[in-house]
């Protein structure tokens, strides 16, 4: 058999031309230190800040400190099986979390992995956890109301869609209850809710999930949990993961409400990471960029311009104070970033005034422009009335005789405090809030005993529902009050027929 050199040469050339080199080039480094959710590695000279890195066991980390000799990495998961000397490689990616409709009704960790035992989440869409906030021209002013269903908030410190309203107070003063009630009240309001639980007990998170399920709120809610037993890197990224999920809805023209419960624990987790990474400590041992930690998170909440779809993210960040000190470092930082604060006081809570909102220290800087006309009319003087009542109440403790005008103010003040009380998980529709506040400010409650105010309120709602339902319908559709004569007649007719006449 003759061997044709030209044929062999052509065959070899063809194979060389068709040769596909099957190898990957990856930049790897070596772990030099591991512990407390932190790793240090050398050899990754080209790693970028915030880049995802992969360890031998499949766990991911995020590059934080880029130094000349090595890099500091926070580990996003179990670090117990990582050893000194293990290899770590670059991925060339930044951290992203799954987003989209399929997350609604689920409980996930900050990596977007389900922890509710209901199977995998079917979604291919992702968003980066760190993203730039909308610019000045991409926003519009807050103009639509977000009804929390809580009389004291919707009347005194109204919240608008796209606002950041801080909820601040000591532990066990009802902060989480306000958030859960606000979420429950979003039923039928075309709002997606995201509840981010940071550093809470897993049993507490479970009970909150069950409350949401009981009231049907889980149908439009995503729960992101980084419990107290999780490594601090997960507590640090949990709020960013939550807002990334919310941004998917906002940029698609929808409205989202996100609750951060609470950012004090995130700041503590970030302080822990920073100290372990040997960053220089500042005031209260927090790192110098702790303000930026929260500002870049809360600035991602916005009301987008109509050109971008008009979607919004409304944020309710929580801060826990010690002994009512709202001048602490983290508290003042977040107060300066947000558009107002709701201050909860322990002494009000313990005296049975719940929600324990201190009207004097609470403020909403932009929510007033989002309040509906009807509420503006009935709640206009409410804050002033409460402030003068508190002042007079302190004065009466000296036991001096009071003239009839002062006594009338005190009586009205006591009834105002009573009207603003509300049961747990009983949010009220805005038209019902308007009606009871109208009855209060127009003197219909002045002759009702203080202890019977809430009974009077419930009975009045039932009566108006069955006899004058068009009053509620008018407020709901026009956002304004019906004719005063119609309201006066309906309330007076109920009062004459009731036990309070």
UniProtKB/Swiss-Prot annotation:
Membrane topology reported for the UniProt record: Peripheral membrane protein
Keywords linked to the UniProt accession: ATP synthesis, ATP-binding, Cell membrane, CF(1), Hydrogen ion transport, Ion transport, Membrane, Nucleotide-binding, Translocase, Transport
A GO-annotated cellular component: proton-transporting ATP synthase complex
EC number of this enzyme: 7.1.2.2
Gene3D superfamilies cross-referenced by the UniProt entry: 2.40.30.20, ATP synthase alpha/beta chain, C-terminal domain, P-loop containing nucleotide triphosphate hydrolases
UniProt-recorded Gene Ontology molecular function terms: ADP binding; ATP binding; proton-transporting ATP synthase activity, rotational mechanism
Enzyme class: translocase
Catalysis performed (reactions): ATP + H2O + 4 H(+)(in) = ADP + phosphate + 5 H(+)(out)
Chloroplast among keywords: no
Function recorded in the entry: Produces ATP from ADP in the presence of a proton gradient across the membrane. The alpha chain is a regulatory subunit.
Family under the similarity heading: Belongs to the ATPase alpha/beta chains family.
Name recorded for this polypeptide: ATP synthase subunit alpha
Gene: atpA
